[in-house]
């Protein structure tokens, strides 16, 4: 009987040790979470916009401007309500004038802006005070104007839109 009690006692202690061992099968780890500054802008539309002036009014130097509003853009930003979009060209225009109108509901459109002389260092604000969030399908309107006194010319320009603080 004594032997049976010892065996039963050892069995119960073994069971208690097994339960304690299995109760310690967890581990913890600290996880650091960060959301970094995100600025993204994308333009949708034709790769090349063709603006051709082919009309004017007799007796007026200013020719009839050419306009295109087939492009849109999408923007996402999570940093600051002081965020803005700027526009610039790859090089100054020698003749004529190129203007841009960039719509926005998250920010304030600057209206139609002349970007003919705006290069990287002198980019023009086209949308200001953009709230944090995202919007898509916002219109971009280009207007090309020239005078009869400018004569005939052709130019190819690259327009860059940039999201900045």
Language-model regions, residue ranges each:
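Positively charged n-region of N-terminal signal peptides that target proteins for export
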Residues: 1-4, 9, 19
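N-terminal small/polar-rich segments of proteins
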Residues: 23-165
């Amino acid at each position: 009987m004594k032997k049976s009690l010892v065996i039963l006692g050892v069995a119960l202690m073994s069971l208690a040790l097994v339960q304690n061992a299995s109760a310690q099968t967890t581990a913890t780890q600290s996880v650091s979470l960060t959301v970094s500054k995100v600025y993204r802008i994308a333009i949708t539309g034709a790769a090349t916009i063709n603006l051709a002036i082919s009309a004017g009014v007799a007796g007026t130097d200013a020719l009839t401007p050419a306009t295109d509003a087939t492009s849109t853009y999408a923007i996402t930003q999570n940093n600051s309500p002081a965020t803005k979009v700027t526009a610039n060209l790859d090089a100054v225009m020698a003749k004529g004038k190129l203007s841009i109108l960039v719509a926005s509901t998250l920010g304030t459109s600057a209206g139609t802006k002349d970007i003919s002389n705006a290069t990287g260092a002198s980019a023009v604000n086209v949308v200001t005070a953009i709230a944090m969030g995202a919007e898509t399908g916002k219109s971009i309107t280009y207007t090309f104007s020239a005078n009869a006194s400018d004569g005939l010319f052709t130019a190819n320009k690259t327009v860059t839109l940039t999201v900045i603080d």
